Amino acid sequence: MAPVYGSSRRAGVTGPWSMLRPGPRSALPRDLFWAPLSPLDNGALAALIARAESVDDPPYRTTAEETAEYFVDPTYSGVAGRDALGVMRAFALVRLRPAGEIYASLIGVVDPDFRRRGIGGALLHWQTERARHLIGTERAGAAPGSKAATTPAHVVTTVLEDDERMKEHLGDLGFEP
């Protein structure tokens, strides 16, 4: 795997934090029907990831037990896109990871048969907006200037070393290795 991609708030006005300022919500593509992702979706989620991994051929395979762990984190937000037959074709998840600093971890996949339609890029925009919201929620109620209010926050994801398409999407958003 390649190094973790991410950015801190220090990235300035050209980094991904600049696109996280308040504004219109991302529009998820209308090719799919979108709904919140929940633990009840785990079977369909594991099947989607298996389809993607069979094409992408990472050096591992994700099990349904592992995808069930996505929902263990107390603070997460996810969305699933389904086709007209109800088959999950894409998902995106943002989780706040416990650490000394705030880490919003992004994970998602688009079914190989539904790629190159703008779904992945739209999901990344959705994820960065959700990350901003979750980080803001984490800081809500903290006294101004307190450690809780000023703890650095990062938006991160991992990318397979040879996944040039994903690296390009992330680069377009200002993320860097």
Residue ranges and their predicted role:
Residues 23, 68-69, 145-146:
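Short, flexible, glycine/charge-rich loop motifs used to bind or transfer phosphoryl groups or to couple energy/partner
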Residues 2-13, 27-34, 46, 84-94, ...:
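Phosphate-binding glycine-rich loops and adjacent basic patches that engage nucleotide phosphates
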Residues 40, 49-134, 156-159:
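Conserved donor-binding loop and adjoining core beta-sheet/short helix segment
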Residues 2-66, 82:
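Short amphipathic alpha-helix that is part of the acyltransferase structural core
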Residues 44-45, 68-70, 165-167:
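Short, solvent-exposed polar/charged micro-motifs at secondary-structure junctions
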Residues 1-14, 18-19, 86, 106, ...:
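Polar low-complexity intrinsically disordered regions
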Residues 29-30, 101-103, 152:
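A general secondary-structure signal for short beta-strands and their flanking turns/coil
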Residues 121, 125, 129-177:
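Conserved active-site alpha-helix within GNAT-family acetyltransferase domains
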